[in-house]
Curated annotation (Swiss-Prot):
InterPro entries: HPr(Ser)_kin/Pase, Hpr_kin/Pase_C, Hpr_kin/Pase_Hpr_N, P-loop_NTPase, Ser_kin/Pase_Hpr-like_N_sf
Record-given protein name: HPr kinase/phosphorylase
Catalytic activity: [HPr protein]-L-serine + ATP = [HPr protein]-O-phospho-L-serine + ADP + H(+); [HPr protein]-O-phospho-L-serine + phosphate + H(+) = [HPr protein]-L-serine + diphosphate
Residue sites binding Mg(2+) per the record: S168, E210
Length: 318
């Protein structure tokens, strides 16, 4: 699900302190929003904000020094035509950056067309970076998954599995080994760009871990600030299963790395069998270390296959 609403007044208040901008025109259009068609088609925040460009309608248009020069340094007829074309773009908001003074013609156009215009001393590049990051997260595809989301050895790991296998207890043991908790039970996941999933904890559950028989634990209060994380990028899913499930549904040595689709992004996946006597925390950390190697281009299984092939060739030659 992708939210499709952010109005000019919300955007203005969100960055009033950071960008120190002023609302210089179009005050009566505080409810003006990004067009739903643009939001649905956007692949990231980069599609929703940028420098003035006549071939990209429906996005926030930023006017820096060069854009203002283009609009004002021409014959009166050309200047009027260039400014009038902005209306056809139907921007949700115009942002005047680089400390540029608002040309009277642009202000008049915004008042007539009821287009909000903000003015800031900050550079146009900085304004675009800030707005793109905000809009990427605000309009991101999102979902909620059940599991324990953790920072393990610097990697965002989502622990999932069948009910009653001890996911939260495993999370607690991993915390005692120096890893960090992001979320327990419900994990909010966002696709912030075409290849990246970011996860965080719902506000109601922040810092909390539920362990059967003990109840709710405030991890931040018990283990300190370093035991919790606000958000992490999802890089690995560790799925816990019972012995019969593993034997029925999974190969012992899969030829290709397992993946799971999350919001259209393939995420590496490891399946771990849970039986009495196994140190699951050690196995999870080993899986994470192996995933880090895979992300660096080192595939232990493929290296073994190649080693086995060379051994067979040597045996056949002799």
């Amino acid at each position: 699900m992708k939210p499709n609403v952010v109005s000019a007044d919300v955007l203005f208040e969100e960055f009033r302190n950071l960008l120190k901008w002023e609302w210089v025109a179009g005050l009566g259009a505080s409810e003006r929003r990004f067009a739903e068609v643009a939001v649905r088609a956007a692949r990231s925040g980069a599609d929703l904000v940028g420098y003035l460009n006549y071939i990209h309608p429906y996005r926030a248009q930023v006017l820096g020094e060069r854009e203002i020069a283009y609009l004002t340094n021409a014959t009166p007829e050309d200047c009027k035509r260039r400014i009038a074309r902005i209306v056809t773009l139907e921007p949700p908001v115009l942002v005047l950056a680089d400390g540029q003074a608002a040309p009277d013609e642009v202000v008049s156009m915004c008042e007539r067309a009821q287009i909000p215009m903000f003015s800031t001393q900050e550079s146009a590049a900085f304004v675009i970076d800030v707005l793109r990051a905000y809009l990427s997260k605000h309009f991101a595809d999102r979902t909620t998954m059940h599991g324990v989301f953790m920072d393990i050895l610097g990697l965002g790991v989502l622990i999932t599995g069948e009910s009653g296998l001890g996911k939260s207890e495993l999370g607690l043991e991993l915390i005692t080994r120096g890893n960090g908790l992001v979320a327990d039970d419900a994990v909010d996941l966002y696709r912030i760009n075409q290849t990246t999933i970011e996860g965080k904890c719902p506000e109601l559950l922040q810092n909390l871990l539920e362990v059967r028989g003990i109840g709710l634990l405030d991890i931040r209060a018990i283990f300190g600030e370093t035991a919790v994380r606000r958000r992490m990028r999802l890089k690995l899913i560790v799925h816990l299963v019972r012995k019969e499930t593993l034997e029925r549904d999974y190969e012992r040595l899969p030829y290709e790395p397992l993946t799971q689709d999350v919001l259209g992004v393939p995420v590496l996946k490891v399946v771990i069998q849970v039986v009495a006597g196994r140190n699951i925390a050690v196995l999870v950390e080993a899986a994470v270390r192996n995933t880090i190697l895979q992300l660096r281009g080192i595939d232990t299984y493929q290296e073994f296959v190649e080693r086995h092939r060379r051994a067979m060739e040597r045996g056949g030659a002799s």
